[in-house]
Amino acid sequence: MQAYFDQLDRVRYEGSKSSNPLAFRHYNPDELVLGKRMEEHLRFAACYWHTFCWNGADMFGVGAFNRPWQQPGEALALAKRKADVAFEFFHKLHVPFYCFHDVDVSPEGASLKEYINNFAQMVDVLAGKQEESGVKLLWGTANCFTNPRYGAGAATNPDPEVFSWAATQVVTAMEATHKLGGENYVLWGGREGYETLLNTDLRQEREQLGRFMQMVVEHKHKIGFQGTLLIEPKPQEPTKHQYDYDAATVYGFLKQFGLEKEIKLNIEANHATLAGHSFHHEIATAIALGLFGSVDANRGDAQLGWDTDQFPNSVEENALVMYEILKAGGFTTGGLNFDAKVRRQSTDKYDLFYGHIGAMDTMALALKIAARMIEDGELDKRIAQRYSGWNSELGQQILKGQMSLADLAKYAQEHHLSPVHQSGRQEQLENLVNHYLFDK
């Protein structure tokens, strides 16, 4: 079959002096960073949905893209053509991984039977493509939010029959992910929330969602899936309020239902923006809570109240994110999935490459800067100094539960404590970060 991207062989690393827009300037897969290949640090993935499923439509306009697999025709044949183009793209872009929702890769059909049969056929197609190309599945998931049946949610739906349909999709998608060697399975509660409290039983919906997640964990162990289960937090959109609001909220939910050892987090930059947090904050929080799993790398727009899903282009922001990830030991089963789409006006098919190339270069440069911060160790040293008092006898007695509140009150009076505030030196530390970013 003729190549879709027929004007491009492969995207290659040409160095920072290159002016070729279809070449990497900073992402060199084989470059060693802290003793590990850059490709192994970053574990890039391209997503199926924004890249090959979105037709350019928005709330104010119809589809703007002319993709051959989005034209009228036999659904399975079009899905197979889409897979041809997707794996051509993955190969030419040099991404080692990809991600999908079930209905991204397979026609949903008019019944559960059709859904299952179509998906089974496409899983065989994807398995062949993976073997042919060497591209692997970072994670799979089920789309339990687009179909009108999920208007009131999937796991939190007031109708147990809808709950059961969603369970069927998750079983099918997880087993497909397992068969394809996927390293993670993601759960994003697109409509697991509410529009108004006037028709919502919060306790009931929370119990339903908790039981659904428990069943997901049970099924994972039943089929022998060794990958990581991931929840992707988001505060709102499409619902007014979603139950997986942010990393800290999800932690409380997992603790309530005894799932904190079973499920980790897939953190998306744009979702952090919508929650009123920085991307850095959500990554650091997930790590501090022991829940860090994977990343959807993109960016939002602080002036807009919706999920713009733009490609990441801020080295400053992502250097701090990569610094946290490196300090935590790096990715295990997770990676950097580009949950991002070209703009509606970007109608040339090669715009898909420009978006991903810029994002990959951004993350590569961020990685190298983060590595310099790790090697220098100055930020860690400053934090250690700031909290050094907790290594004293008093600090350790407090942390080990050897002092009560009354004991501390007595200690403070007997020792005539009069502590003096020590400067946090925020401005100096911000200057230090700029040194790593901009001084060669």
From Swiss-Prot:
Q: Where does this one sit in the cell? A: Cytoplasm
The residues that hold Mg(2+) 1 are E232, E268, D296, D339
Q: Which GO terms describe its molecular function?
A: magnesium ion binding; protein homodimerization activity; xylose isomerase activity
Cofactor binding note of this UniProt entry: Binds 2 magnesium ions per subunit.
Q: Does the keyword Acetylation apply?
A: no
The terms describing its cellular component in GO are:
cytoplasm
Cofactor(s) named in the record: Mg(2+)
Biological process (GO) annotations? Answer: D-xylose catabolic process
EC number of this enzyme: 5.3.1.5
Q: Broadest EC class?
A: isomerase
Q: Where does Mg(2+) 2 bind?
A: E268, H271, D307, D309
The UniProt subunit note reads as follows: Homotetramer.
Q: Which family does it belong to?
A: Belongs to the xylose isomerase family.
Which named protein is this? Xylose isomerase
Instruction: Give the source species.
Output: Escherichia coli (strain K12)
The lineage is: Bacteria, Pseudomonadati, Pseudomonadota, Gammaproteobacteria, Enterobacterales
